[in-house]
Amino acid sequence: VRIPVGPFLITKGQKEKMYLEQMPDNKLRLIYTDGRGIWAIPFTAPLRGFVEEVDYFSNKKFQMLFASGNKLYLLDKTGRYTGPFPKSVDSLILLGPKVYEHNGDFSIMLLHTDNKLRLYDRNCKPVEGWQDITTEEMIEGFPELMKIGECQYWILRTRLRTLIYRHSGEKIGDLSGKNALL
């Protein structure tokens, strides 16, 4: 699994593009596109591959959501952690978070080190009715959420096959060999 290391583009809620980067000593730094620093804060561990922008408080002020270890963090653009974060989940995070927006809210998907994709609500609680997605081969990325009519499906591509799941995580299709949509 390739873990992106950034810098991570930050665009929502401001006129000028910025990047959040993790420095060699694990500090987090927000910079302008020309490299000028805005701030830097201490951090103790590597990020797990993505920084997503969310409007957690529904006030049109976006925060940066990211993961490390078994925790999710929410950082505002002034470099302050915002409550009620950090939030712990039950197992180590290999890759994430990946945010899926819907109906003015969002869900958070994480790939855990036990090769399971799990969906969480905005408060980092497992989504009720969700069935973890797991495969025999290593999951290397997040599924695509596809809407067909009124239904939504997760399309997960692995090196060997294409798997289709209901929005709840229930597996309904397995395309392998020459039928795989890789």
Language model regions located:
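Acidic, glycine-anchored loop motifs typical of Ca2+
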Residues: 10-17, 56-63, 100-107, 146-153
